[in-house]
Amino acid sequence: MADLSLLQEDLQEDADGFGVDDYSSESDVIIIPSALDFVSQDEMLTPLGRLDKYAASENIFNRQMVARSLLDTLREVCDDERDCIAVLERISRLADDSEPTVRAELMEQVPHIALFCQENRPSIPYAFSKFLLPIVVRYLADQNNQVRKTSQAALLALLEQELIERFDVETKVCPVLIELTAPDSNDDVKTEAVAIMCKMAPMVGKDITERLILPRFCEMCCDCRMFHVRKVCAANFGDICSVVGQQATEEMLLPRFFQLCSDNVWGVRKACAECFMAVSCATCQEIRRTKLSALFINLISDPSRWVRQAAFQSLGPFISTFANPSSSGQYFKEESKSSEEMSVENKNRTRDQEAPEDVQVRPEDTPSDLSVSNSSVILENTMEDHAAEASGKPLGEISVPLDSSLLCTLSSESHQEAASNENDKKPGNYKSMLRPEVGTTSQDSALLDQELYNSFHFWRTPLPEIDLDIELEQNSGGKPSPEGPEEESEGPVPSSPNITMATRKELEEMIENLEPHIDDPDVKAQVEVLSAALRASSLDAHEETISIEKRSDLQDELDINELPNCKINQEDSVPLISDAVENMDSTLHYIHSDSDLSNNSSFSPDEERRTKVQDVVPQALLDQYLSMTDPSRAQTVDTEIAKHCAYSLPGVALTLGRQNWHCLRETYETLASDMQWKVRRTLAFSIHELAVILGDQLTAADLVPIFNGFLKDLDEVRIGVLKHLHDFLKLLHIDKRREYLYQLQEFLVTDNSRNWRFRAELAEQLILLLELYSPRDVYDYLRPIALNLCADKVSSVRWISYKLVSEMVKKLHAATPPTFGVDLINELVENFGRCPKWSGRQAFVFVCQTVIEDDCLPMDQFAVHLMPHLLTLANDRVPNVRVLLAKTLRQTLLEKDYFLASASCHQEAVEQTIMALQMDRDSDVKYFASIHPASTKISEDAMSTASSTY
């Protein structure tokens, strides 16, 4: 109609004659030429000519169009090197355009043009470095904000794709950025330049960052005039630390970080709190423990609520940086090798190289060049799977991961037994075994000397200096009895490798000296531990008199001068006290095995609370983490603080190790009963990871009750448990695992019936659970759920359920005898193959199709048990069933060799059925019965059919 109206208007303009080329009176036909019949001037121009024409246009949009079409122009002239260079020269002129939108449009195209130049480098060498990079660098200081932003994005994109040569980065990019961050530079430009420097540091590497970027970055951290600059530095501090490495971080960056953490602007301090974990990862354990911990405590107690909030969110990740294999107890062991073979291999491996922390070695095998700060003795593995082995091993081979402090303070009993085993129990070897077999560098010694003065060392009663050899000769009088170690292990003496540091009288003196400083949380914790030890030792004094005398004699004979390289760190003072306490009471001993932890029920609740002292992380940090469940924190810090605590808990648990799980147990139970479902949901999604960390014994004792509670929680919480149901149940003992068979049915019931994804996830998990249960359990408990899901209202749930049923058929048929498999097939035929509803009969065809595709049944068995019932559906009254049957027979069944090679009666029956379907009255049935199997995908067609039956 629009064309007719235009035609009428043109006819009325007779005077002009415009638009009328010819008029034939005979045919009365008006011929109107199209605009395509004319050749425009632009088409007559070369690509370079069009570029020049529009680049010189006064119309801004034309110049923008030129910038947008530069890449296409380059592609047109890429065969001619001169034309390519000419286009690049036009780009340089276009970069001087006075209109900011044109410059911004040009900068958006630069990364694409640079990539093109890189791909065509032989024809246009150095094109990017000569023509494009100077424009990008110049625009970093452009007056227009949009142009600067696009140039910054372009620069980062070019660096990320490695399109800028290293030489150009050093000579063209970095000098400009350093100039832009000069004191007299524009404030906005300076802030943006600092951000660019920080973001490009990981891309350019350590060398360039350390030489060119780091000095200016340190200056910007101290920018007194612009807090925005300091805030950018603080926000990117972790990235810079991770690039430059540990030495540069500790020497140059940490002093600036301390200044930023005490900045008078709360936004700067908040940025420091957010990147604290990354900074911690770039420092050594000693600095992390002695300096960063105290700094972090200051941030947690910051006057600004926003700083405290960020600090508490980073607390869990920061604690996780203290993790190492010796404290977490997580390391790999090849189950196929015996303990003796592992020890021999480790001994050979550690002769020529420094032993890593996650390698199992005996104490006598520890190389002498290990430093105290990084060494850890991991003895023979006594995880729960090897508890029976551990009971028959010497005490010196118990698996106890030790940190550097415990390495210097191994118990005399453990060393005596180790010496007896290796040196025929000669008395002269006690001294050599007590002497540390690790060396310290001069730097480590200096640091340890500085930390020797602390509250514990200052107020404690000095240990007596007694000659060890003389006292041993007086008390032993000769060789120790070969039965000595066995007798000690049978008595009430604890098997912990710790030194008894004081007698009961000395403990009382320690408490008396510490009481004036009870305001200090660390001192208070020490006093509580010592008090509990005194009470416990007095209760059991009449039972342990003999064993305590023996141990106190050995303790009095320990000469401190024999341990010149063993200093005690400030943070290690608390665990050493607790170690002494644990040695004085058999109920307070250091445990690594899961079975011991789960069976150790001699603590009263008060005593267990008082003994939450560990040596993996500074106790003050752990106390702050445990306080995150305090209701007052939600009011004074963050309403989501409990959720952050729950999110970080698996990492904290891994850091502390399963031997310190008692420190977190109460907190975990508090979080599991939190009123906010988001907190419980977070725990539900990670409970399987925590179970791996704790092992089966602790999981059964502490996690299973909470897991059971989650099963009855809201759907938002239950989905977290359901998504990792297999991962959790496989860690449980078979008897405990079978208890959940009765509860799987409950997952079919949801708060909202429309929550079909819940049922789909259940089907996915049931497929994985098949391997955990016996054929009888699968048939009795999982089969009803699977058949229920096959009849679900939602096609996606049904589709996964078909896979579940087929895997179930495979497992049950492979069992001996295959009775359960035959019964399941008969039930499928009865409930689905002969179902009065057409959707049930369609489901039967889907199951048969999946069984064939996944080879869940041998074809001869399929032909006997399922195929006869499948072929009867060729006469089904519903076309959808016949369509799916035609697809299954033609595209799946006939692809199997069994039906291609053999000329059996089964093959004849299939061919007759297909011929009948080819003559079906429904066109779709005819099509799929006649189509070649390779011309379409069965899964796509099947899914389309399934979705049509929602």
UniProtKB/Swiss-Prot annotation:
<protein>
    <recommendedName>
        <fullName>Serine/threonine-protein phosphatase 4 regulatory subunit 1</fullName>
    </recommendedName>
</protein>
<feature type="repeat" description="HEAT 6">
    <location>
        <begin position="168"/>
        <end position="206"/>
    </location>
</feature>
<dbReference type="GO" id="GO:0030289">
    <property type="term" value="C:protein phosphatase 4 complex"/>
</dbReference>
<comment type="subunit">
    <text>(Microbial infection) Interacts with merkel polyomavirus small tumor antigen; this interaction bridges small tumor antigen with NEMO to inhibit NF-kappa-B.</text>
</comment>
<dbReference type="GO" id="GO:0019888">
    <property type="term" value="F:protein phosphatase regulator activity"/>
</dbReference>
<comment type="function">
    <text>(Microbial infection) Participates in merkel polyomavirus-mediated inhibition of NF-kappa-B by bridging viral small tumor antigen with NEMO.</text>
</comment>
<feature type="repeat" description="HEAT 8">
    <location>
        <begin position="248"/>
        <end position="285"/>
    </location>
</feature>
<feature type="repeat" description="HEAT 5">
    <location>
        <begin position="127"/>
        <end position="164"/>
    </location>
</feature>
<dbReference type="InterPro" id="IPR021133">
    <property type="entry name" value="HEAT_type_2"/>
</dbReference>
<feature type="repeat" description="HEAT 11">
    <location>
        <begin position="568"/>
        <end position="606"/>
    </location>
</feature>
<feature type="repeat" description="HEAT 3">
    <location>
        <begin position="65"/>
        <end position="81"/>
    </location>
</feature>
<comment type="function">
    <text>Regulatory subunit of serine/threonine-protein phosphatase 4. May play a role in regulation of cell division in renal glomeruli. The PPP4C-PPP4R1 PP4 complex may play a role in dephosphorylation and regulation of HDAC3. Plays a role in the inhibition of TNF-induced NF-kappa-B activation by regulating the dephosphorylation of TRAF2.</text>
</comment>
<feature type="repeat" description="HEAT 13">
    <location>
        <begin position="799"/>
        <end position="837"/>
    </location>
</feature>
<feature type="repeat" description="HEAT 1">
    <location>
        <begin position="1"/>
        <end position="25"/>
    </location>
</feature>
<feature type="repeat" description="HEAT 7">
    <location>
        <begin position="208"/>
        <end position="246"/>
    </location>
</feature>
<dbReference type="InterPro" id="IPR000357">
    <property type="entry name" value="HEAT"/>
</dbReference>
<feature type="repeat" description="HEAT 9">
    <location>
        <begin position="287"/>
        <end position="324"/>
    </location>
</feature>
<feature type="repeat" description="HEAT 12">
    <location>
        <begin position="698"/>
        <end position="734"/>
    </location>
</feature>
<feature type="region of interest" description="Disordered">
    <location>
        <begin position="413"/>
        <end position="438"/>
    </location>
</feature>
<keyword id="KW-0597">Phosphoprotein</keyword>
<feature type="repeat" description="HEAT 2">
    <location>
        <begin position="26"/>
        <end position="63"/>
    </location>
</feature>
<feature type="repeat" description="HEAT 10">
    <location>
        <begin position="505"/>
        <end position="542"/>
    </location>
</feature>
<feature type="repeat" description="HEAT 4">
    <location>
        <begin position="82"/>
        <end position="119"/>
    </location>
</feature>
<dbReference type="GO" id="GO:0007165">
    <property type="term" value="P:signal transduction"/>
</dbReference>
<dbReference type="Pfam" id="PF15017">
    <property type="entry name" value="WRNPLPNID"/>
</dbReference>
<dbReference type="GO" id="GO:0005737">
    <property type="term" value="C:cytoplasm"/>
</dbReference>
<dbReference type="InterPro" id="IPR016024">
    <property type="entry name" value="ARM-type_fold"/>
</dbReference>
<comment type="subunit">
    <text>Serine/threonine-protein phosphatase 4 (PP4) occurs in different assemblies of the catalytic and one or more regulatory subunits. Component of the PP4 complex PPP4C-PPP4R1. Interacts with HDAC3.</text>
</comment>
<feature type="region of interest" description="Disordered">
    <location>
        <begin position="473"/>
        <end position="499"/>
    </location>
</feature>
<feature type="repeat" description="HEAT 14">
    <location>
        <begin position="861"/>
        <end position="898"/>
    </location>
</feature>
<dbReference type="InterPro" id="IPR033461">
    <property type="entry name" value="WRNPLPNID"/>
</dbReference>
<dbReference type="InterPro" id="IPR011989">
    <property type="entry name" value="ARM-like"/>
</dbReference>
<feature type="region of interest" description="Disordered">
    <location>
        <begin position="326"/>
        <end position="374"/>
    </location>
</feature>
<feature type="compositionally biased region" description="Basic and acidic residues">
    <location>
        <begin position="332"/>
        <end position="365"/>
    </location>
</feature>
<dbReference type="Pfam" id="PF02985">
    <property type="entry name" value="HEAT"/>
</dbReference>
<feature type="modified residue" description="Phosphoserine">
    <location>
        <position position="935"/>
    </location>
</feature>
<keyword id="KW-0677">Repeat</keyword>
<dbReference type="InterPro" id="IPR051023">
    <property type="entry name" value="PP2A_Regulatory_Subunit_A"/>
</dbReference>
<dbReference type="GO" id="GO:0006468">
    <property type="term" value="P:protein phosphorylation"/>
</dbReference>
